């Protein structure tokens, strides 16, 4: 299983939200690149970046910080938030981002996502509230089931699906393993769990369930998960 520590960018700072609410943002660092460097030192291969301002604005908003992270770290970077066109995808890949996460656009224009996945390293982000897909920075809930959206991309050439249970995001109440497995089953793709992870109990449960990867956010920042121990456990498997 792959562990992807997360950095959420808001107004140039590293923050965490609770349940996706912008007003709940808690600042953890004024220098996000230093956080990424720390993840690298702890043994991470990947960092999961989210441009929160971009997710709401529909265009890149934290470019300087993203550049700084790329310049200062040798990690693989995946990035989501505000990516709505091919020009933005190319720009980020030219910057050295390894793969890009398409979320809201996957609901609104699945054909576009298929076209992009045929050309570029693309991950689909499926965010759900009570099993229904949430879009536009989680500000709106669609009438589409998350599992139906996952099926849509089964043969589209995307690298993975990141599925977030919005109700658990930043709450450290445990990962929704059943939801993650349902997405994996529907798509047949590598599936990464996001939202709710708290400690090693969750890491072990995810490994046991055969989940491919997990995003680690608040559990690291609040100190409930020892990331080094988590990497050791995963690598021992």
UniProtKB/Swiss-Prot annotation:
Its EC number is 5.3.1.16. GO terms for molecular function: 1-(5-phosphoribosyl)-5-[(5-phosphoribosylamino)methylideneamino]imidazole-4-carboxamide isomerase activity. GO terms for biological process: L-histidine biosynthetic process; L-tryptophan biosynthetic process. Keywords: Amino-acid biosynthesis, Cytoplasm, Histidine biosynthesis, Isomerase. It comes from the Bacteria. It is found in: Cytoplasm. It catalyses: 1-(5-phospho-beta-D-ribosyl)-5-[(5-phospho-beta-D-ribosylamino)methylideneamino]imidazole-4-carboxamide = 5-[(5-phospho-1-deoxy-D-ribulos-1-ylimino)methylamino]-1-(5-phospho-beta-D-ribosyl)imidazole-4-carboxamide. The keyword Amino-acid biosynthesis applies. SUPFAM superfamilies: Ribulose-phoshate binding barrel. PANTHER family: 1-(5-PHOSPHORIBOSYL)-5-[(5-PHOSPHORIBOSYLAMINO)METHYLIDENEAMINO] IMIDAZOLE-4-CARBOXAMIDE ISOMERASE. HAMAP family: HisA. This is 1-(5-phosphoribosyl)-5-[(5-phosphoribosylamino)methylideneamino] imidazole-4-carboxamide isomerase. It comes from Sulfurovum sp. (strain NBC37-1).
């Amino acid at each position: 299983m792959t562990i992807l520590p997360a950095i959420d960018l808001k107004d140039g700072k590293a923050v965490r939200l609770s349940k996706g609410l912008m007003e709940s943002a808690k600042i953890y660092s004024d220098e996000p690149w230093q956080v990424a460097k720390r993840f690298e030192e702890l043994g991470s291969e990947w960092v999961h970046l989210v441009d929160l301002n971009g997710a709401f604005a529909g265009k890149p908003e934290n470019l300087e910080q993203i550049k700084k992270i790329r310049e200062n770290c040798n990690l693989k970077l995946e990035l989501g938030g505000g990516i709505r066109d091919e020009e933005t995808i190319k720009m980020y890949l030219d910057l050295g981002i390894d793969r890009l996460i398409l979320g809201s656009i996957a609901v609104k224009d699945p054909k576009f996502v298929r076209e992009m996945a045929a050309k570029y390293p693309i991950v689909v982000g499926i965010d759900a509230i009570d099993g229904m897909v949430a879009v536009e920075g989680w500000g709106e809930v669609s009438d589409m089931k998350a599992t139906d959206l996952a099926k849509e991309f089964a043969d589209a050439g995307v690298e993975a699906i990141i599925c977030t249970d919005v109700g658990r995001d930043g709450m450290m109440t445990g990962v929704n393993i059943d939801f993650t497995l349902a997405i994996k089953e529907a798509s047949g793709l590598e599936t990464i769990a996001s939202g709710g992870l708290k400690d090693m109990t969750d890491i072990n449960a995810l490994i046991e369930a055969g989940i491919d990867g997990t995003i680690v956010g608040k559990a690291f920042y609040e100190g409930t998960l020892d990331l080094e121990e988590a990497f050791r456990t995963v690598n021992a498997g």
